[in-house]
Structures are given as structure tokens and as C-alpha cells.
Amino acid sequence: MEEYQVYLELDRSRQQDFLYPFIFQEYIYGLVYGHDLNGSILVENVDYDNKSSLLIVKRLITRMYQQNHLIVSSNDFNKNQQFWGYNKNLYSQIISEAFAIVVEIPFYSQLRSSLEGAEVIKSYNKLRSIHAIFPFFEDKFTYLNYVSDVQIPYPIHLEILVQILRYWVKDPPLFHLLRSFLYQYCNWNSFINPKKSISSFSKSNPRFFFFLYNFYVCEYESIFLFLRKKSSHLRLTSFSVLFERIYFYAKIEHLVEVFPKDFLSTLSLFKDPLIHYVRYQGKSILASKNAPLLMNKWKYYLISLWQCYFNVWSQPGTIYINQLSDHSFHFFWGGYFSNVRLNLSVVRSQMLENSFLIEIVMKKLDTIVPIIPIIRSLAKAKFCNVLGHPISKPVWADLSDFGIIDRFLRIRRKISQYYNGSSKKKSLYRIKYILRLSCIKTLVRKHKSTVRAFLKRLGSEELLKEFFTEEEDILSLIFPRASSTLQRLYGGRIWYLDIIFSNDLVNHS
């Protein structure tokens, strides 16, 4: 019990005061105002001390201010007049952007210390890597029997995002300032169309919104993983230590009322160590090899958690539990599709004079090439038209020949590195053809020639040799050609370790 209490106890000494950095408002306004508001000011890999003092914050803001040379000169007087006097929305946006920069500093150090010190989070930290998703699907997923695709719901109101911060912040004026930012973009008292309000806010203030949303997901997953680790049965004693926290602990008694009380003695014998949890974008996957009864238990856990703690309305019918032997599961992450499909194999066996047929169902992880969404994205990026016919890229025509080829090569390599694992490569060849011909037409546009004349003049030159070289040839230069191991590796699944970003060309929203 003491172990649970230590983990769940809210450490008041680590709560943060956030308003004091705003005494350096001239630095903050200049820092954010001079930067592109549509971009992001990322503070990466900075070893912040856990003791974030006033002096540390002042030095950091001053250093960022000086490095970006964002001093507003007197020549910008007219523009500043419009900024300070008339454009209130931009004024609020600048303050909120600066606010997001400031509050990320102590939360970064606190999150890092939590990841280093809490045993509950340590095992989960390994799953934060993007690379861990692909081996999971390849090595684990095909051996599981039940899967549930869960859509993480958005909070019905932005006030819920603000309330989540109350567990970590003890500065009441901070929340008034926070609400004043949100009030600029949506009607605070309106519940008619919350999705539209959240969508408009996320577009106008992306960094600020993602800070709140990521904190919401982090809070949800921390509670979920605690339940996952500590509640291997449904006894009420497992949750008796949870009554300390605001809101959630006041309503946690509803969380254990998942099944009738007659089942409690039976369910206490079940263990569920094989519940796998994977989150990608705004969705998550629950998969298990056990009976569907345990999957139903966790489904109602999630429903009760969202309703009781986050006040998010979600119904059990929105979460479907499917059996992989009867259901082909589609997985989408960062612009990439994967599919677990079933292969039916018929084996003829003969025993003495009798022969019989045995049907074996095998699950196989296969990658799908979403040809229509990719062509739509290529057309949006001006590589082809809506019908998939390649066109030149005019904005790249001013680059050098090497620069043009290098940019096309990067895009093609990123797509090829993932989709080469697909068993159906016809669609992939079409994408490669579009990129190749678009590259040639861009070079033709630069040299003011025709495609036929350019290719004829190119002749024996090896300018496009790398672009037309397939990945099989590139791998054969790295490994021995006569190696049969290479053929077996390439014929199977190869997850390239440089797939660390989402596919920008595919946007399914």
C-alpha cells in the first residue's frame, strides 16, 4: 500500500510557479514576435536542472533572445503600433506562444526525472520509440488472438485540459491567464460544437494546443499504465489507495463496477500479463492472446476512466473487440498502412493407406501501398496532377541539378524503405515512375529543353544513375552478391531504422 501511495502522491514541492518568468516580458514578446508564428521554437536536449529558479529562467530567455537577434528596432514603429494597438488576436497569440515556451521548461525536467525515477514508467519508456512499433507488429502481433482499435477521445471542453494542470501547478493566476488565451479562440461557455472550437484553436496556436493535448494524453496513459501494472484482478483493495486524487478518486468506485459482483471472486483468479498497448497518433491498440473476457474488462476500464476522470463521453459500442482469425486488421501510422491478413494453406497428409487434407490458417503481416492517397498527396505537392500524370516542380527549377535529384531521391527513398516490404509492388512502381518522370521534367524545365532532347543529350552521363538504381542493387553493394542470406533478408521484412518521421506525402485527414 505504501508503494502505491508513494507513486500516486502528489508532490507539492515539485509544483511550479509559472508567472514569474513574465517579468521578462520584453524578451518573451521579442522572442516570439520575431519568430515565424507558424513555425516552432524547439528547445531540444537541454539539461535543465530540476531546481528551475528565477535566475535560470532569466538566463535561458536572455540567451534565446540574443541568439535570435529579435530586438525590435525603432524603424518598426508603425508595425508595432498596429501590433500593440489594434491586432488583439495576434497579441494574444504571441503571449500564448511565449507562455508555451516558458511552461515547457519545468515540465520537461519533471517528466525526465519521472522517467528516470519511476519504475512504473521505466518499462513504458521503451515503448515510446517509433522503432518499437514495427518489431511489435512483426514479432508479437501475429501471435495474438484478439485486438481492439481504440480512438482516444478529445476532451469535450478545453476547460478539462486546464484542470489537468491543476495536479502539477499551484499558481492560481496561471489558470486565469490560461483561460484568457483560450477565450480568444472559442466561446468558453459553449458546448454546441466543441470539436470545431478545439480544431480552430489547434490551428491558430499549434504549440500551445499540443502542449495541453500531450499533457492530457500523458495523464491518461500514466493512470492507464498504473492500472495495467497493479490491477491484475478486479478486487476493490487494488484501488483503495486511489482515493487521494481530485475528481478521479472521488469517482473511482464506478471503475470497479464493470461486472456484476458475483463475478468478482472468479475474475480475481485471472491474470492479464499479455495485454499489449500501442499508441499511434490519436489512436491506440489493445491486443491480447487471452480470452475476450479480459479484453472486455479493459474496454470498460477505459470507458469508465474517460467518463469519470476526464468527463469525456464515450460508449462501449465505439470500441470493437475483433478476433484476428476472423478479422483482417488495418494499422495506420504516420502515413503508412499495414495489414494483418490471413493466408489459408492446404496440406495433404498421408498415413499408411489413408490420406486427408489439413487446412492451416496463418497470419501474415503485410504492408499496403495506399496508391490513391499518395497520388492525391503528390498532386497537392505539385509532383503530378490529380490523375497521376507527372509534372515538373517549378519551385525547384532554380536549384542545381544535384540539388533537384537529391530532393526527389530523398522522397522516393523514404517511400521505398517502408513499402518495399509489400507483397504487391505494382502500386509502388507507379509512385516511383511519377517521381522519376517529375524529376526529369523539372530538369528539362530548368535547362529549357524537351524530355526527348534532354534524355538524348544526357546520353551516357550517369547523372540519374542513382535515381534509377533500385534498393536491391544498393543492398548488393553493401552485402556480398553471392550471399543467400541477403536474399532471405530482403525477401522478408526489413524495417529501416531511419524511419523516424511520419510520411509527409500522405495526409488522410
UniProtKB/Swiss-Prot annotation:
Q: Which PANTHER family match?
A: MATURASE K (PTHR34811:SF1)
Name this protein carries in UniProt:
Maturase K
Q: Does the keyword Coiled coil apply?
A: no
Name the GO cellular-component terms: chloroplast
GO BP term, pick one: RNA splicing
Record carries keyword Amino-acid biosynthesis: no
For this protein, the record's Pfam families field holds:
Intron_maturas2, MatK_N
